[in-house]
Amino acid sequence: MEGSDFVDPAFSSGERISASDLNSEHIIQAENHSFANRISMDMDVPDGHQLDSNLTGFRWKRVLNPTGPQPRPRHGHRAINIKELMVVFGGGNEGIVDELHVYNTVTNQWYVPVLKGDVPNGCAAYGFVVEGTRMFVFGGMIEYGKYSNELYELQATKWEWRKMYPESPDSGLSPCPRLGHSFTMVGEKIFLFGGLANESDDPKNNIPKYLNDLYILDTRGVHSHNGKWIVPKTYGDSPPPRESHTGISFATKSNGNLNLLIYGGMSGCRLGDLWLLETDSMTWSKPKTSGEAPLPRSLHSSTMIGNKMYVFGGWVPLVINDSKSTTEREWKCTNTLAVLDLETMTWENVTLDTVEENVPRARAGHCAVGIQSRLYVWSGRDGYRKAWNNQVCCKDLWYLEVSKPLYAVKVALVRASTHALELSWTATTFAAAYVLQIQKIEQPLNTSSKLLSNNIVQQGTPTSAETSGINISANRSGSALGLGVEATSTVLKLEKESLQLSGCQPETNVQPSVNDLLQSMSQPSSPASRADKDPLSSGGGTTFNLSTSVASVHPQISVISSTAAVTGNDTASPSGAINSILQKFRPVVTAVRTSTTTAVSIATSTSDPLSVRVPSTMSANVVLSSSSSTLRIVPSVTASHSLRIASSQASGNNCRSSSAINILKTALPNVAVQSQPTSSTTTSIGGKQYFIQKPLTLAPNVQLQFVKTSGGMTVQTLPKVNFTASKGTPPHGISIANPHLASGITQIQGSTVPGSQIQKPIVSGNVLKLVSPHTMAGGKLIMKNSNILQMGKVTPNVMGGKPAFVITNKQGTPLGNQQIIIVTTGGNVRSVPTSTVMTSAGGSASGTNIVSIVNSTSTTPSPLQALSGQKTLISNQSGVKMLRNISSVQASSSMAFGQKQSGTPIHQKTALYIGGKAVTVMSTNTSMAASGNKVMVLPGTSSNNSPATTTALSARKSFVFNAGGSPRTVTLATKSINAKSIPQSQPVTETNNHSVATIKDTDPMDDIIEQLDGAGDLLKLSESEGQHGSEENENNGENATSSSASALFTGGDTAGPSRAQNPIVMEHPVDIIEDVSGVSSTTDVNETAIVSGDTIESLKMSEKENDDVKSMGEKSILSDDCHQPTTSETEAATILTTIKSAEALVLETAEIRKDHTGCTIGSLKENQDENKKFKQRQESSPSQNIHQFQNVDGSQLEALASAALLQAATSDTTALALKELIERPESETNTRSSNIAEIQQNNVQSTLAVVVPNTSQNENQKWHTVGVFKDLSHTVTSYIDSNCISDSFFDGIDVDNLPDFSKFPRTNLEPGTAYRFRLSAINSCGRGEWGEISSFKTCLPGFPGAPSAIKISKDVKEGAHLTWEPPPAQKTKEIIEYSVYLAVKPTAKDKALSTPQLAFVRVYVGAANQCTVPNASLSNAHVDCSNKPAIIFRIAARNQKGYGPATQVRWLQDPAAAKQHTPTVTPNLKRGPEKSTIGSSNIANTFCSPHKRGRNGLHD
């Protein structure tokens, strides 16, 4: 019979079978349509059959010693792949079988699943495709001469067969029974082409008929159950009839069109032609190819990997003779490999190893699948060994590496120590070795203060060596950025003892960069016109930096004026005018530094909330914020002594506030004095008298001059001061304004509460009070201070340990609902004061007031002098913790206020134990419950000046957190609040925009307290409407300790760092700031990134300062698109290493509204286009200071994604400049962006750069090599400098020629230093792409390590029982306690967001290294279903210095339980490596893949 390939008694009882019966080849469709798994190959077309130099990595390898029940050798079978599984069905040798075997290419294991349902008869030479987990089998030979046209579906999730009955086509008949056809998945449909039919009714009398018909099988939509056959109308010449050919599908790269490619087969003789069906137009064509085509063949395999088709084996003609082409009857099997580049249609015939033992034997009728970078071939007929009575089949399994490995996963931190980092990583599929590289994150010297002093305000004019320096600059930044990374030393190095009064005159440029970034913009023709055309233009606000040093007798004071942006309807201040910037004036102010106080006369307009921050290393940090007449106390974010006023505008899409915020910070108790008009007013500040000389008769708006009367010193004038008289009330505000800008006047109106007296027991701590003087007629007082913000000393005595405070409000105006909780933080149980008083004075209260007093050891009542009969208490004691977080929320006019309160006591609501310590929550009076904020303050445990974050509240419940050893505050805002203000004195605020997934609106206060401990553990960035960008902030080091809280925002519009706008300007995928403490790297920055060089402001804090800084209040920040942990049942926990918040600053950036996207640095739209490209990049350009986030568009398969910002440590100048640039209108951005580079030059330690993708790497960003490892873990103690081994060194290596690194010198790791790591996999083809970057930090001595060997057992009655091994013994510190955190479900509102959010709750704190989490808590646990259902725990240990790194562990659950939980978003990931993300505030956030082998005793 013509066309007989062989005589094979294999499939029936010794009967002869024509070649056409079984001369059919399996089709691998699974890979054909799976574009996500395609791998790019960098190959050149070889000359002839010679192996090109780029293809030298092609080496066959035989799989040795697989485990499990191996299938019997066979041919005529087919195989598809589902992920890393190869599924083999049918075929046979001594009879056709219905066996199904599965081979796991990762574990090298065969297994036989238990099948159920309508198991089909054994068949051979059938069609086999896969769509997701649905496999379809069509046709084939059932027995000799009997073919099938039945269709079966196999569901891989249940291994259940189902027979399908597809509908017939609308015109024509269903496909006839056949074998040797191609069955190819093209897009969402299955294409059936050709095959061999039997025209005889008698199976024994076989009459072969070659087919070339084309059918489409639709298995989607309404046809998903049974399917439907479609006979498409095609154009062009169809391929000739054939069988035993192959079909693959691919997409044209240029236009994305899907194509069906038919190759080879048999039709009486071997065929070697190619036919292309363009499925959009259904047009057949015969593509032209270049290169030397392989021999014609049938029963071969064609497999798509990447953009290439790999043809292996099959029957080929024995002799090529054109005259016998139609009658050729001699053939042979081959083991050659041919490669067709589908983009260029070029054949790349490859010559492989000729040693017989190193290559598969020649075969036909085998099966082949492509799994990632490998081509697997199994069994088939042995072409060299055939007999008349028996076919010999191969029983070997081979694979061929055809491309370099996929990009490696992110490295995980197992354990951190002072001089070593133990890392681990998940195996990259088919990688044989790994290259690990390291990059040190340079930590600038502690000279940021000097930078500021020199760069911002260096044009001072010395006037006296006995006075403090005052530097004044104008700035248009709308953000309240604290300037400077503050360490134990002063922010501004106090090198000059002379007074410096510098200003930016209109005609003078201090420096190009400083002038552009810090100097005010050109004055608008009118404030109104400016606001109309520039919604981002700023209202009036003044920024003062007053920095004092305990060690310095002549501290330098830096005053910076900035405008606060006013957006939308908020362009007008309450007075009807826009508060313009205080530009270019040279005030004459003498701040005399004494050992007791430093005083500054400050006045701002009523529309500008004023925050006074009083930090001190010896005492607690306090900030008093005044919004109109309301007070706000916010903690200091600095570890040094500085007085600052920063201006910011709280405005956003859903947040409206017409006032800016001024923050005044000072290191010592300060007095903010406001004088009322009298014939003469004197103020004693720091032992010096200041006289205000003015006319005896004062009319409203009298302009005054301050005269400094120090002996021997010249008198200099200050900008004129306006006194605005108020009817009915004596208080008047002193306004410091530019004499040329009437709209720039800001003022504070004092309040007067006649006859009120407050005298309560008070703690020996710092108490901030507002003192209102009594009323005098006729201006006869020589000295009147209408508002005194005073910190004084209180001598301890036995008055009962009750702290007291006073909030004075404008008279006649009800206070907004205020809840004040005061918690003392002694070593024992905390006591809560019952005598807290809020007084309302005059004016209008539109915000919330929060005062908390903690950490007292002794108390005393200390009455002051009576002013108008009102007695107030002041106290100040070094070493005592003070007021914590406050949130000033600007309320709308429709906000419901509580009744007018004057001296309203706060009533206790409930007492709880938090962190093992008693805490009492105070609830407001019922009359005040109509609106306002509830504030909860948790006790701190040490006196530490660590960064704190003051955040505005959205209308939803929010956490306000302090980042150091300070009490935690949780503030819940009512729905009526539509304005938010976030005065942030420096870039240390990290989580202004993170949504809370743990708090429901109806949560009782005690529930909130429970979640407060974990509040800071994991923060999700909330993307609000109109938010053009999303910033993922990694908390600096210790933003949440066990005794400090983290701020979680759940509002739709979250408050930006200094505005109520969203925090970052970039489009959502862009996460731009990189911070050392934001440990884990992020990759794929998709837009122009604004970066402050890879520098970390290393602030050396004393042990005392760091007591509470190390803590477990960790936050995992979820990227909007990334939230799913890595795969694998034995995923071990990610270990987080600690980075102190004081050692790294996060640059706060305000987001520009959508209509101002052009205001970003660089062109935002251009970079949005770049996003798509960079999302596909796993590797961040080493030169970029920002690491690009992988899958920022939501394309992750993990539940906790790479959310941590690589936070960029920036100097204050950089932060301010960047902030200003971001918020500046586009027209101004272009003119100013060019000057950013100049700041880079000026700020040596902290550079600001506009990062454009693919920038060249600088010297500090070179990667150094740790080594090449075949294991999946390594303890890094040293590395080889890049000068010895560069990146190009690894370009030519593969697994067979690994270098020897022992000859190179190595550099040891340093303690307390942050490093970046990246990993690359190596196989026989070479080195793959670099994976995502992770950042970890070596420990500082004295802190505990991470718990290990975590074991979790389940008790049906009690819950989950956790045990763990303590960290390695500390030399000097003992473990005091452990904290265990549990990931909890998101709230309903959070679920409604674009991306689910995750939060942690502390479920245990105690000294024992074991705990039981009750079922009640587990019922609220978040079940991560990204891979295998798991509950996530975190455990950290604490010693006397603080909390060490945490260990995260995933506890696998029953998959059935996962169905009851909403799975997290699982978008497509670039080639699929998975990783888990864990973050903490003081613990270096790490994001890594699970440890598949459960190393280090960590259990999944």
Swiss-Prot record:
Ranges of biased composition (kind: Polar residues): 517-528, 1477-1488
Fibronectin type-III domain: residues covered: 1244-1341, 1346-1457
Basic and acidic residues compositional bias, start-end: 1166-1178
Keywords: Autocatalytic cleavage, Cell cycle, Kelch repeat, Nucleus, Phosphoprotein, Repeat
GO CC annotation: ATAC complex; histone methyltransferase complex; MLL1/2 complex; MLL3/4 complex; nucleus; Set1C/COMPASS complex
GO MF term set: chromatin binding; transcription coactivator activity
Modified residues (Phosphothreonine): T1126
Entry-linked Pfam families: Kelch_HCF
Kelch repeat residue intervals: 85-133, 135-181, 189-237, 259-307, 308-373
Classification via SUPFAM superfamilies: Fibronectin type III, Kelch motif
Compositional bias ranges of the Low complexity kind: 1036-1047
GO terms under biological process: chromatin remodeling; positive regulation of DNA-templated transcription; positive regulation of growth; regulation of DNA-templated transcription
PTM comment: Proteolytic cleavage occurs between amino acids 900 and 1100 within the non-conserved central region, giving rise to two independent but tightly associated N- and C-terminal subunits.
Annotated coiled-coil segments of the chain: none
Additional notes on this entry: Due to lack of HCF repeats, the cleavage process occurs via a different mechanism to that in the mammalian HCFC1.
Protein name: Host cell factor
